[in-house]
Amino acid sequence: MMEEYQEINKILHEIDDGNTKRKVQLVKNKKDGKLYVCKTIDFNNNNETKDSKVKREREYLFLKQYSSPSFSHLNIAKYIKHFETRDNHGYLQKLTIIIEYYEGGDLTNLKNLNEVLPKDIIYLFFTMLVILKEFKNSIIHRDIKPENIFFVKNGPDLEFYLGDMGSSSMVITDQKNTLIGTNQYMAPEIDLGGYTCKVDIYSLGKTMLSLITLVHSPMNSIFESLFQLCTLENFKIRPSIDQLIEFVCRQYDQSRYTISLSSYTHPNTRSIIKYFKDKKFNILKEGEKINFKIDIQSKFYNCISVYRGFAYNEYIVEEEEKEKEEYQKEENQQSIPNVLSIVELIQPPLQDLSKDFENVLINHINYIRDGGINGSIRSLLHPDIIIKTKCDRVKGFEIKAHSNITNTEGLFIENAHLIYKPVNLSWKKIFLEREDEITPDVQLKAVFLSLLVAFKISNDENDFLTGTLFDKLMEHIYFVKSPSLPPPSQISPIKEPLSSYELKISFPFNHRAHIYGVKVPLNPNYLNLFFGGEIKDTLISNLIQTLNILAPNNLQYKSILIKLISIILKEEKRILKSYSNLGLEIYFKEFNEIIKNEIALEGIVSDKLLVSKIDTTKKIEKIRGFRNGHSNSDADIYISEFKGKYYAIDKFEHIPGLFEILEPFSNKAIDDFNQHFKFISTFVDVNESFGLVYTIFELPSSLINSYQTTRKSCENKNILDKDKTFRNLLNQHLSYYQNIQNNRYKLNGTDLTSKKLSFTEYQYNIIISNDCDIHYYFSFVGKNGSGLVQSFFDIGAWVYGDENVKKIKVLSFFYLLQCLFDYQTKNTHNSVDIDFPNILYYLKKFYYSSLVDYGLNGMDSSSKIFNYDLNNSYSFIKIGFLIYNILDLYKPNIIPDQTLYYDSDLIVMLLENSSNKFLCFRKQYYSDLDKTKLKLTPENIVPQNNDNDNSIILLPLLIIKDDITSFHFFDYNLKDSIKTIEDFNNEKECLLYYLQNIQKNPSNANSLVLINLNLFEENESTDNESFLFFDIFYLIKQLHGLSTIIDSWDNFISSLSKPISLVSNYIQTNLKKILDDPLSIDILYNDESMSHFKPFIYDKIKEIKKNVWLIRDKNNNNYIRKLSGYIKSKFKEVEKYGFEFIDDVSISNPYLKIAVENGWPISFLSSHFKRDNSNLFDYLFNKELIILELLKEKGVDGISQLESYFVENNIIYILTKYHGDYSNLEEINELNQEDLFEILVQMSDKLKILESLQIYHRDIKPENILFKREIVNGNIQSKVCLIDFSISDFGFILKTNESGSKMYQAPEIYQEEYRSKENDITNQHYKLDIYSLGFTLSHLMKKFNCNPPSLVQIVKKMIKHKAFLLKQPTL
């Protein structure tokens, strides 16, 4: 009984179709603790026929039958047991079935897996074929879809099971014309009446096509073509289960020695093939077989496989029977090599690296994913050429092969280059079939040839192609009679000894979607070509063993190949003696030449050689911060050793064109700046991920053993020792800088002393040795004005740690000064000038504060560096033509903005101009700054007037601004009184006061203000003044999730008072806090200017359905509150609500077009569409709000009435009238003939009005029609009200929209043959709402056993399946 199972609070599925209630949920067996699926079916319709009651038992009978041991080969959800309750007549009332639980879930969960492989998709298809073959003469499933197929992970593989037999039908006993199934996967003939087991073929094809999008690895496109055939609408030409089985068996046989074999690598796929063959399911007459034809160079082949690679298409084909017969007749042959691999190169070969194979160089091809199974390759050398990587969809049984290359001029290239590879002569096939004839010399030739080819590619500096060779396991070796491959029809089967044949290599095209530049992992089994066979020479065993040792070390491929060739040459004498005159001499000649060239090259220290000798375990940390604008992912320099010399190698990611712009360092070397690191060269390697640039220096001897950095030792020092270390490093740094400034150096004839701060104009790096000595080197020449300023902060961060350094005010000063001084900003809206005395002025603060803190008497000996008069030496900032000394810099306590390149969106500056001092807030709105200097105009300089009656709001004294940056000046004496929202928790009052100020002074809306906190009640007793820094943009960022600037401030201000705005959202969301605060209530209810901000106060009464509530306002009025949209910027936060039916609303929205064309009043649209594109408050609505406003404007009666709408917690809600005295038609217990006619008449009137407005309700059903009877003037009258427009839409955009309740939907909504017509739906003659109304009336007539003939005739016309072909009844 069910007592042995414990329910788990996880309902998987629940549905009530009026006759039955189905609930599927997880349960746990109390004894073994295992999870199972419990399917409970309640049969609650007492009016159903005897036959329908008998059919109730079919599901568990089917499950029970196919769960028996005799059907163990079928992957069907396993029946465990069932429980039943029967009525007095013995019919089922309640059925509970316990089924095996599959932890992966259904196929819709496959998208959560990291990768779905082609072998999984093919195995799933084979598994379903086994089941459908078993069902063929007895059962039709009728509801195959992803939701009814379940999977579990079995190690790296997937296992699949077909479930939900509830829709299944017996072939013999049932007339198969019932509308059972799922819209998207339902075969068209089901709706037309009369169908066969081919409906399951259709559903399976649809399911497989939906799953292909999850496969990111290249897949044999023939299978997609096969799945397309399964979904042909004409079931007469749709393939049968027997045809499909014969095709896949033949496909497997023809693909055994090709790249297509990877499709069949699931461990159970081959057992299914064997099962089909043992049962002789794979035998069909020739005329019944499925064949895909392909035309290549005017010759037709039967196509077996189609793959798209990076720069090629590969087809596995078989010659047609006619061709085979003619050839056999001419050549008098018994068997012929009729299976070919034809490789079509998209681009002609750029270079032949060997006469034995042809190579396509792809160094400059960058792989780009377009999404789904579509992909493309864009050539960086020729960006106008795009190579498509997805096979064209087939039409019928024919494939047209072409190269799919087009450029912007529309040129088309076909058959750029073809390579014919005879599959029957491949190394793998010959070895497996004639292993006894594979002599030792043949084995050695194969190994030697593969190594030579790999070396030639590697020597051409293409590790990617070498890795491809290593990865393909010799699938590219073929036996041929002559150096060139003859045409396929001339290739004869091998009869002579294999040693008399030549081995040739074609390029090993790799079908896995490697992103360009990613190094293919070395396959340690690369040389093990013998597929478990005997290795017939010890040299090969030695090579394989060596390769297995070297593979895990991540060495460069060329180094591995040199090692292997050296081993081969040690046995040259033995090999040539043992296998004389067998053609091995040519290989040893090549090997000796390779080693000779490598020895000659060792005398020259090449850049590539030094890079190859990098020891990744030996690296030195560099002080960060001097390479802004480039990747800082590698914060170390690496050490390379060669012949006793040590080299420092720095690297960064190569950006195409960057190295050409930055001239090689050797052209601009500054010897004196480079005195610690002697520059060698710069080397670009594009074979690694996106390419790397290596800068090579000679490593100073004092750094050779500095693998352990002082950073680690600093972490254990106390603060006093850290201060000493920092002062020592600063002394070295400043002394070095001073020496450069005091001497004359020339760079390419240019006098550096004529340049101010020349040292800071070049990007350099700092290295600190174990002895705390500073060393410098330049990675490349580039301008960076902030280098020197930033260096003080970075050295401090290195000593104190990233967190503690921010506590040292003087160092934070340099960080913020660097933000102002950065090359991106210094020449734009403001500029900062700084010189040597200015730097020392701020550093002196650190020296003196340290000495005072630790009781030290006087400066140490190194203080002689301060040889300048430091009195009143400041850095200064130019704002337009006004100059201010920078007395101090700091950041307020606000949440950092991580979206900016620098965290420089807000800096507080203490400035001095003559005798006047100011507190200045510098606000930067965008990280990308305008390159035009600020021109001061009357509009730029805005003096402010603080003589207003609002003593709470303190406005700036002066504002200087452009479109990107603004400077707000306040009284200097307020500098110690500033707080932020993070410091103080009175946001609600501050916001409301600020809004109050905006309403009275709109021109001040976009300025930064200070709010006097002492005037709030709880702060009146505070002795010291406190002012809250208030920035409306910062508030928008925190409350609304956006950081932007408003192009039209006036529009923004006017939007604040609209029903849907930042303000109304904030107030409604924080309603409880605001209503608990007397001060907030006073602002909202006693100030007339704030009256439109009053919140909507209501209580929830009950939830009617998801996102729909009955609510009551403070005046006891009842409403229906429905979710209708959301604030667009908060999309990620409200995804959980499910907004499939909500569309973007913009100025180009088609609703405006409808309004204009029909002459409607569009006042109700203005609040939705008259918005600037840059406005923060862009919304997403469903159509319900717009449609209800239109119907309200038109005064349409008997339809759900819109009362109002509001926004809360970023969600837009609409309020409609609550019809408490009505009942929906599904709830009503009694209707008579007059009632049904009244419903028809009133609903027809409403639909006619909706049609005139081009509105389609789309969900007419009993639950959405309200009905009541009332007495008027002594007479009983019936009233009907149509509600729930949540999925309603305008006519001309209805195509392919399948929303709605299936039972009441017109067939054209979900049947493919009626979808996607060329003409708009408005030009077609069907009436989908009429169909739904007809089906509703049909349901009510059956429910209440009321069938007046006239009404029956009308309803029959309303629900004709092909209603669009017939003349509709007049409404």
Curated annotation (Swiss-Prot):
Keywords: ATP-binding, Kinase, Nucleotide-binding, Repeat, Serine/threonine-protein kinase, Transferase. One of its GO terms (molecular function) is protein serine kinase activity. The active site is at D143. InterPro entries: Kinase-like_dom_sf (IPR011009), Prot_kinase_dom (IPR000719), Ser/Thr_kinase_AS (IPR008271). It comes from the Eukaryota. It holds the Pfam family Pkinase. Gene3D superfamilies: Phosphorylase Kinase, domain 1, Transferase(Phosphotransferase) domain 1. It is an enzyme of class 2 (transferase). ATP binds at I15, D16, D17, G18, N19, T20, K21, R22, K23, K39. The keyword Lipoprotein does not apply. It catalyses: L-seryl-[protein] + ATP = O-phospho-L-seryl-[protein] + ADP + H(+); L-threonyl-[protein] + ATP = O-phospho-L-threonyl-[protein] + ADP + H(+). Residues 9-269, 1131-1371 form the Protein kinase domain. Its EC number is 2.7.11.1. One of its GO terms (cellular component) is nucleus. SUPFAM superfamilies: Protein kinase-like (PK-like). Belongs to the protein kinase superfamily. Ser/Thr protein kinase family. The protein kinase domain 2 is predicted to be catalytically inactive. This is Probable serine/threonine-protein kinase DDB_G0293292. It comes from Dictyostelium discoideum (Social amoeba). The lineage of its organism: Eukaryota, Amoebozoa, Evosea, Eumycetozoa, Dictyostelia.
